[in-house]
Amino acid sequence: MSATQNYGTGRRKTATARVFLRPGTGKISINNRSLEQFFGRETARMVVRQPLELTETVEKFDIYVTVIGGGVSGQAGAIRHGITRALIEYDETFRSSLRHAGYVTRDAREVERKKVGLRKARKRPQYSKR
């Protein structure tokens, strides 16, 4: 891998994002679409930008992302995790501020499986005493 780009893998729920940071002007490309085209919701866009705003590197990098799996929220979280890891690879001094904000830790919460005899993961059929 060349020294002109930094790489980070991010995961959240069932989504996986591969993130490449290259020196640039702040353009974010996700699956060959712009951030605005890819995410309709402003909250998802905000989540993606959080690590860049925290480290004040919004206009410093062009970001290229490939994301697969999951839904809107999971993909946004995976991209944030990937950007965080790539920023740490670029400059290790970012780690403490990113860790304090909670972006370095992989959110391990996954969907709980549905159990036999139950309607959902934990929802039980109505109990009848008589």
From Swiss-Prot:
Q: Could you identify this protein by its name?
A: Small ribosomal subunit protein uS9
| GO MF annotation, one | RNA binding
- One of the GO biological process terms: translation
Record-linked Gene3D superfamilies: 3.30.230.10
Organism equals: Azotobacter vinelandii (strain DJ / ATCC BAA-1303)
Q: Does the keyword Ribosomal protein apply?
A: yes
Annotated keywords: Ribonucleoprotein, Ribosomal protein
**Family note:** Belongs to the universal ribosomal protein uS9 family.
